[in-house]
Amino acid sequence: MRILCVAALCCASVFGQTPSSGVSSEWDVREMLASLQARARQLGPILDQLKPADWVRNGAPAEYTTQWTTAKHELGYLQTSADTLARAPEKLAAALDTLFRMQALNSTLGSVIDGTRKYQNPAIADLLQAIAGENDHNRDRLQQYVIDLAAEKEHELQVMDAEAQRCRSSISNQRPQGKK
């Protein structure tokens, strides 16, 4: 029974630690995600206006069709990932997934913008680029949030490890009580 009490005290001290002040609040994260999603939603209708099959018929590489399809899928994945992160902003995996989805979309979108500029309409390409550029600030904020969240999680693990070591030491130093 005594060992259980010591273990409970150790766990309570670990979970009673205050979070690092470097990580954005949940409200700030949700606000940033709402802005990110609003900008991303603007891309969908513009991507729908693109006709990469026509580009290919006019001599463009067939890869543009694949990249356009990939960009549309990545846009959907980004929305889903951002929704998941908004529901659980403390989840490092969700934050990383959202950041990686955003980077993948930006990478693919760059090629689609180039194709749009060359084979369809430079004004549409400029519009896509402007909307994607408006999300650069959100991408930077998300990246900083991921870094801060990872540092916080690493600190929490260090505290838990130190407390576990202290508890093990405390338990191993106790003398066994004889039976009465």
What are these regions (language model features)?
Residues 6, 19, 23-26, 30, ...:
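A near-ubiquitous, low-amplitude feature marking generic local secondary-structure context
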Residues 83-139:
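Surface-exposed, polar helix/loop patches in the mature regions of secreted/periplasmic/lumenal proteins
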Residues 14-18:
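Boundary at the C-terminal end of the N-terminal hydrophobic targeting segment
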